[in-house]
């Protein structure tokens, strides 16, 4: 376990070592942090690529890491612990130079199973939000105590720099679905936050954390939203506990398509959440800088190289070829194997994606949605069938030519569909770049759309660090390139307002 914590002296030394890399002060803590941080959503200790990307980022001068107990079911924190411990052991970085943030609230995977076991024992976590099958939420002090112990073990740390309540508004969502009045729900919501803050102050006293805060997706929401989290109300709670409280950091989503953090006047004095945070000298982390959610569609703010889009006729023919190949498996391959009727039916069900593609290929909405379906739904199904067939003892020689042929046909169909969505994404990226460039001359200096999205945020007064999911070393390099370019931090409210209602 690494002792110590991030210090003003240590982070200043990091900033000096990596000049002209750009850093800023994190609230009143005196800590200097890079204007882009390593966001650990969807990274895992078991993936070498993620390990190398985090290592590259830390050595390049990125000195803020944001993770959570539920990311990769604990694997994200384990990755941070392993990489940081390795670099610290070899004296490549020091504990004092890097700010580590983690979060608490979700019960998924292992935590969900822990919760079910406690229920069976008659000792359920208190104030548990039963949100959905496989998903619960909790910010009760008892749960926070349990989770902080586990997080510190995975991170291999004695002390965590910042510990955030992770989307506590899940309670408000649950309350709305179960008929609790909005007035009663909000009263209970802020009461739960107060109890959590009281406990977090004791964790500061114990030396297990230095500061605490909240990460909420609804900080930038309209005040009329039933799930809105009022920073002003949260600040009042912290102030009521002690004039020397340790509530020092918030996190919220913001990007070129979702500028509410700047433009939504949702505090009682007409300020935005970012303005209020700036006045109270709170640190502000921004998440989802490159992933916008518009009308339930995921839009990736990164440039995609366009290719010639295949025609509808070409795609239809390729999908017909795929359906024919699926039919060959049913008619010629499976009858030669010693499989039960039930197993044959399962194999056919798994591999039958041609019909779905024929009906739906043009309705997936965006390149990001199509890529997600292709990579995490369709392709794994096919791989599962191929692996199953290759393991059969009754395998005949005719199976191997079919496997090779089917994979080629599948790749051709996937490629043709991708070409359509890639063309759409490239056109959309060009329109977005033009709109953003006209909104602010400083933003126009960025080389790529992803760098433009980062530049817009890091140049906005009140934003401390932008969290970027740098899962590959190439993503790290893209961020480092942008952070090496000078840009003034200033009030850019008018620039952000020009982006409101930006069309896809």
Language-model region placement:
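Fungal eukaryote-biased detector of long internal structured cores
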Residues: 137, 143-145, 150-153, 157-158, ...
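Short beta-to-alpha linker loops that shape the active-site pocket of alpha/beta-hydrolase fold enzymes
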Residues: 68, 163, 168
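N-terminal binding-site loop/beta-alpha segment at the start of enzyme catalytic domains
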Residues: 1-120, 126-130, 134, 142-145, ...
């Amino acid at each position: 376990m690494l002792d110590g914590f991030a210090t003003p002296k240590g982070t200043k030394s990091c900033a000096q070592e990596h000049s002209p890399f750009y850093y800023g002060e994190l609230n009143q803590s005196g800590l200097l942090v890079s204007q882009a941080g390593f966001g650990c959503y969807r990274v895992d200790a078991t993936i070498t690529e993620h390990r190398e990307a985090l290592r590259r980022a830390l050595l390049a001068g990125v000195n803020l890491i944001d993770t959570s107990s539920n990311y990769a079911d604990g694997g994200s924190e384990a990755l941070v612990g392993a990489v940081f411990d390795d670099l610290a052991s070899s004296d490549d970085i020091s504990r004092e130079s890097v700010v580590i943030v983690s979060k608490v609230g979700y019960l998924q995977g292992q935590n969900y199973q822990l919760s079910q076991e406690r229920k069976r024992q008659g000792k359920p976590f208190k104030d548990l939000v039963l949100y959905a099958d496989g998903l619960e939420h909790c910010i009760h002090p008892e749960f926070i105590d349990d989770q902080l112990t586990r997080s510190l073990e995975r991170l291999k740390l004695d002390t965590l720099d910042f510990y955030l309540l992770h989307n506590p508004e899940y309670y408000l969502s649950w309350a709305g679905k179960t008929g609790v009045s909005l007035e009663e729900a909000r009263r209970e919501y802020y009461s739960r936050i107060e109890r959590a803050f009281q406990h977090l102050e004791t964790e500061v006293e114990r030396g297990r954390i230095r500061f605490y805060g909240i990460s909420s997706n609804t900080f930038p929401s309209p005040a009329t939203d039933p799930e809105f989290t009022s920073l002003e109300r949260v600040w009042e709670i912290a102030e009521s506990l002690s004039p020397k409280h340790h509530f020092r950091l918030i996190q919220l989503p913001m990007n070129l398509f979702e500028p509410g953090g700047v433009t939504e006047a949702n505090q009682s004095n007409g300020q935005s959440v970012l303005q209020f945070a700036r006045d109270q000298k709170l640190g502000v982390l921004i998440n989802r800088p490159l992933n916008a959610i518009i009308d339930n569609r995921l839009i990736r703010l990164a440039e995609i190289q366009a290719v010639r889009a295949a025609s509808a006729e070409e795609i239809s023919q390729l999908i017909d070829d795929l359906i024919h190949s699926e039919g060959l498996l049913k008619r010629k391959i499976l009858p030669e194997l010693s499989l039960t009727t039930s197993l044959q039916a399962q194999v056919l069900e798994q591999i039958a994606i041609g019909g779905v593609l024929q009906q739906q290929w043009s309705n997936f909405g965006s390149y990001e949605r199509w890529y997600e379906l292709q990579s995490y739904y369709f392709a794994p199904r096919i791989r599962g069938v191929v692996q199953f067939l290759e393991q059969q003892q009754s395998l005949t020689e005719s199976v191997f030519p079919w496997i090779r042929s089917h994979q080629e046909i599948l790749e051709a169909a996937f490629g043709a569909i991708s070409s359509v969505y890639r063309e759409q994404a490239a056109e959309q990226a060009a329109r977005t770049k033009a709109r953003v460039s006209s909104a602010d001359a400083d933003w126009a200096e960025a080389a790529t759309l992803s760098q433009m999205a980062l530049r817009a945020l890091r140049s906005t007064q009140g934003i401390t660090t932008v969290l970027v999911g740098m899962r590959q070393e190439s993503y790290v390099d893209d961020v480092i390139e942008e952070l090496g370019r000078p840009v003034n931090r200033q009030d850019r409210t008018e620039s952000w307002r020009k982006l409101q209602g930006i069309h896809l």
